[in-house]
Amino acid sequence: MTLPNTPLPSRDLAGRVAVVTGGSSGIGLATADLLLARGAAVALCGRDAGRLEAARAHLRQRHPDAAIDARPVDVLEAERVRAWATEVEAALGPVSMLVNNAGQGRVSTFADTTDDAWQEELRLKFFSILHPTRAFLPQLARQAAALGDAAVVCVNSLLARQPEPHMVATSAARAGVVNLVRSMATEFAPQGVRVNGILVGLIDSGQWRRRFDARADRSQDWTAWSGALARDKKIPLQRLGRPDEAAQALVFLACPASSYTTGAHLDVSGGHSRHA
């Protein structure tokens, strides 16, 4: 993906270590890029070794002097995630920011979602958060004591509060993640570890780019096509969100700028939400 050429932010996160799961593309890659720009050392993971290496090379080109660690990890494999946490600390130091980003949505209705599909979707949405959080929590707690702040941030979806019938399993799982975030926030607060999430709406991603490539009206460019989609979906800002816009919200919640915020979800949907 092409990341925007925005002015470099201050390096206020120098000396801190961040972890981003699902970091090889989209929101994860944009988040890693922003964290590096602000001076943090960043460890990222993904399941596809080729895409992960391409992401690492891209980030290295943009941040030649930064500390970057990229390793293939399936966050649903608990033992591998525990080993990865040890590897990250050895390579970069103890972690104070964890961004849980792994997990895509499933398109299915109640009628055509099998028991196996339900279990697979619930496992993906919950354990892609549980495994990394368990593995890195000891480091986060130590850094909260040492630095005065540490945080877990989870990428969630507007489906959590605004379910769609064609994504019934994903909508239900996303709603559960809202309460998981609140529960962890309460439990981890005595250790100084904050837990928050973001609710993303329609974000420019590979999914939408593939639909654009298959569009019937070949006269439309991306801006016209995606704008029409946004208007059809009744998004007030009349466009899709960009990965870097979601990344800005994630980094805000991960860094000390949000030091008195925990158990919350920030809406990043372009005004698409209709919930109270």
Regions found by a protein language model. Give the residues of each.
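Substrate-binding pocket helix/loop in short-chain dehydrogenase/reductase
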Residues: 109-110, 114-122, 231
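Active-site helix of classical SDR
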Residues: 133, 173, 181
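Short C-terminal tail/terminal secondary-structure segment
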Residues: 2-9, 162, 250-251, 262-276
